[in-house]
Amino acid sequence: MRSDSIDGAEPLYGAYPGGRRLSPMDRYMLDFQRAYPTRPVSVSGYLLRMSGSPDLDEVRAAVLDRVRAFPVLTERLVTRRGRAPRWEADGEIDVTRHVREYPLPAGATEDDLRATAGRLSGMVMPLDRPAWEVGLLTSPDTGDVHVLFRSSHVWVDGLSQNRVLTFLFGDEAAAGATTGPAWMRTGKLTPGGLVSAARRQATTWAGPSGALAALTGPAADGHSMGWASIEVDRLRAVGQAYGASVNDVYLVGMGGALAAWSSPLDQLPVRTVLSVSARRPAERSILGNAFVATRVALPLELTSPGERFEQVCRQTAPYKGGSSASLSDRFWSDRVPSRFGRRTIGGGQELRKAAVNTTNLGPIPGPLAVAGAPVTAAMPVPPAREGRRQVVVTLGGLGRTATAGFTVPAPRAAELARLWLAEIEGLERAAGIVPAADQAAAALVADSASR
């Protein structure tokens, strides 16, 4: 029996001699991956643009230096007879398996770069070694080099992965600090809060999601990807104008973008799965999964910005500030019998439950550099999966720039990205906000093939 206390004073899991126990969500992810070995259980990856072109040997040497500095990067899944699986750091890696080159075709364009990133994001990450990879996407014609980082969701959640990226490419002193992910939950569990959480989850997950016409036609040949970038301060200014958070701005923008992108097929609300951090302060220095999922009905029909924000904020309010709502949700999530745990993972990926899947990781603090080459942009790559019909969106970025990455089972992801950015700009105008002209900060990576 676990020793987690009702007031949350003790961590639910931690680093122990002989290895780190899997959190319940880690185990659900593992069970899902084992049940469906050809379906990737991946965190949204990151495509890093750089000012410079380090070669494969240079990147491998730089990564090895960081692995020696941060042995947690050598954690691998170990299963021994009679014992539950654990993460154990063995102190070394085979760098040729973890840092690999993926040459782009001759004459490669941005479309080829996106296609390669999407293809790699749909590959299963092996669990017989540390569950991450640094891929160099090289262009023989231009000499350009991009890095695609991807990892298994069995090992980390999105916030933990931000920390892993800092271990590998961030300032070494900052990476070694034990501040951990920024979104900690300090609230206390109470009997009343647990009852409210049970009711909230039952209500939130009741009934199907509305459908979008763009997702119900014949399956597309692969997925398309798109990105939109904007200054974080602009998102904050919009949120302040409407009494909302950056996450609310993100979701309201998604609702408007989807309404312009595709018509609904029924009268049901179009819902998105939203991941919410449930990480305790005692877990700040530990990797692994510490989140819960809820559903949010997106405002596709309401025309007034105030009405749209009211609808979203009403649903996200329980999880804001020092609330213990996500910890209360996690209390119940952690108690799902293991034989049913993988169903909770698969259910959130079903179109009938949610047409959209959204995550907000926040920008990586930065600065980052790969073998001395400064990283100029970090673009989330939501994982593609054959047969998955949802729109998958991740808000991340680097430093003061937020970037939303879109993976869509249709050839129109870049259009959706443009529409999301246009929605944010429309919310600015409605609030009387005039942002400073900065084309670099408000750049949209366009998909020329979709024009």
Language-model-derived ranges and their functions:
Residues 30:
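Conserved donor-binding loop and adjoining core beta-sheet/short helix segment
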Residues 2-27, 36-389, 396, 400-401, ...:
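Soluble acyl-CoA-dependent acyltransferase catalytic core bearing the H(X)4D motif
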